[in-house]
Amino acid sequence: MLSEVLLVSAPGKVILHGEHAVVHGKVALAVSLNLRTFLRLQPHSNGKVDLSLPNIGIKRAWDVARLQSLDTSFLEQGDVTTPTSEQVEKLKEVAGLPDDCAVTERLAVLAFLYLYLSICRKQRALPSLDIVVWSELPPGAGLGSSAAYSVCLAAALLTVCEEIPNPLKDGDCVNRWTKEDLELINKWAFQGERMIHGNPSGVDNAVSTWGGALRYHQGKISSLKRSPALQILLTNTKVPRNTRALVAGVRNRLLKFPEIVAPLLTSIDAISLECERVLGEMGEAPAPEQYLVLEELIDMNQHHLNALGVGHASLDQLCQVTRARGLHSKLTGAGGGGCGITLLKPGLEQPEVEATKQALTSCGFDCLETSIGAPGVSIHSATSLDSRVQQALDGL
């Protein structure tokens, strides 16, 4: 087992095109969001395994000897396995969480224990570890925060247990694992996501593992070969939404008006495919006119999503504010509030960007400038992380 400190990060995700249509067998494009979750793992010898999640105020510790003495045969040794309902109940006993524990805390702890016990039980003795996870991603905003958490845990635990090698060499600031190792990280992260979401699609953990852009179609996930990093504004309207109700609303509208809604879904599919083609071209040789196409696709998709009934007054306001400044926006994810993205073309002056952010903030929204198409799960040297991240991991 490794004895050094590991620093791992993984990105969030946004849906670029295809939300809601994907439920009806159409293509969706998901891209990594360069708001990241950071994990620090420190092996120690105090006989405890500590988990600290400062974003949601969690600090938990378990006695390694007690975990070691448990009958963990309910966790099948060998390949990556899917957690069963019996395993979940057993893990709840192991976790020792109070009955009034918040759902977010319970799920985060169960995912951690499942991955820790499943990955580390092949060791002669369960390792004594101190793990801190801090995220730039707001939870529950549809930005893949739970997947980034699961990916960071899987990567760090597999590395510390030497199931996969540490790719960080002397002198490296940051590095990534091989394709084969990333596949194993992704498989375990998917099981962590299952602990949290029950029946996830696998898109969020795949985007967080691989980075860049992915295409999702009828259960099949594939990476776009070359996708450019694009600058965006990510705006959180802070309007809560009920994803299940929004998905049901689209289904009901499709049943009520099949000849109207089915062509809308087909058209959204065509938007996703055209965007995929343009991103491929941009990866080889970016040109200004390609940004114009991306902007048109954003506008068309936003109108289609409004026609499906998943818009919201807050999202209309976001689009109006940015359109007044010559920028193009759409909702991302379930709609009905939540988040929206605004494409920032190269050459846009920083004062213009700041003025747009200010205008959106004055609407009561949270607005961040970031990029999409960021690298997937990565391992960092201590000196390469900025002081803000270091302080957050130190609990300062």
From Swiss-Prot:
Mg(2+) binds at S146, E193. The active site is at S146 (proton donor), D204 (proton acceptor). Its EC number is 2.7.1.36. One of its GO terms (molecular function) is mevalonate kinase activity. Keywords: ATP-binding, Cataract, Cholesterol biosynthesis, Cholesterol metabolism, Cytoplasm, Disease variant, Kinase, Lipid biosynthesis, Lipid metabolism, Magnesium, Metal-binding, Nucleotide-binding, Peroxisome, Steroid biosynthesis, Steroid metabolism, Sterol biosynthesis, Sterol metabolism, Transferase. Disulfide bonds: none annotated. It catalyses: (R)-mevalonate + ATP = (R)-5-phosphomevalonate + ADP + H(+). ATP binds at K13, N55, S135, G140, A141, G142, L143, G144, S145, S146. It is an enzyme of class 2 (transferase). Homodimer. This is Mevalonate kinase. The gene is MVK.
